[in-house]
């Protein structure tokens, strides 16, 4: 079983989604997990403990294991991500320029089949960018941070 498959099976078995996996040259293994309700430190601890056990049993060599949430600027990698975050603001970087641009910022529309839509502000007002997962170099949510006090 490949490392990604092993980790994804473990993470999904615990009720989480594997968002991303990075392995650095210095033996560090970074795992990014999510779930609809969000991720708390206890979730990261739970996944870390289970992965440490699984990686030891499978004799996977690593120096350090880090499990965390994908953050406010979460990457979008799967069609299900675009479905889940439809209506959210995102930045999409295409592999090849379209109309002289590679980077677009706008509001995601729910995928229709394999086609994803992004409503953005063009030169002449609102415009729609249609693309597929194969067209994307990078896609991330735009963080929404509210610094207003919650007290009323």
UniProtKB/Swiss-Prot annotation:
One of its GO terms (cellular component) is cytosol. InterPro entries: Ribosome_maturation_RimP, RimP_C, RimP_C_sf, RimP_N, RimP_N_sf. SUPFAM superfamilies: YhbC-like, C-terminal domain (SSF74942), YhbC-like, N-terminal domain (SSF75420). Keywords: Cytoplasm, Ribosome biogenesis. Pfam families: DUF150_C (PF17384), RimP_N (PF02576). Its main location: cytoplasm. The keyword Disulfide bond does not apply. One of its GO terms (biological process) is ribosomal small subunit assembly. The keyword Ribonucleoprotein does not apply. It is found in: Cytoplasm. Required for maturation of 30S ribosomal subunits. Belongs to the RimP family. This is Ribosome maturation factor RimP. It comes from Paraburkholderia phymatum (strain DSM 17167 / CIP 108236 / LMG 21445 / STM815). The gene is rimP.
């Amino acid at each position: 079983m490949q490392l990604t498959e092993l980790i994804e099976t473990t993470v999904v078995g615990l009720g989480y989604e594997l968002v991303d996996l990075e392995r650095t040259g210095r033996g560090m293994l970074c795992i990014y997990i999510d779930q609809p309700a969000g991720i708390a430190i206890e979730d990261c601890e739970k996944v870390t403990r289970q992965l440490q056990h699984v990686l030891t049993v499978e004799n996977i060599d690593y120096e350090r294991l880090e499990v965390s949430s994908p953050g406010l600027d979460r990457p979008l990698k799967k069609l299900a991500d675009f479905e889940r975050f439809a209506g959210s603001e995102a930045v999409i970087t295409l592999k090849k320029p379209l109309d002289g641009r590679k980077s677009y910022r706008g509001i995601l529309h729910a995928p229709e089949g394999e086609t994803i839509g992004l409503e953005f502000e063009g030169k002449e007002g609102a415009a729609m960018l249609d693309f597929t997962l194969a067209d994307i170099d990078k896609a991330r949510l735009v963080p929404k941070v509210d610094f207003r006090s919650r007290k009323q």
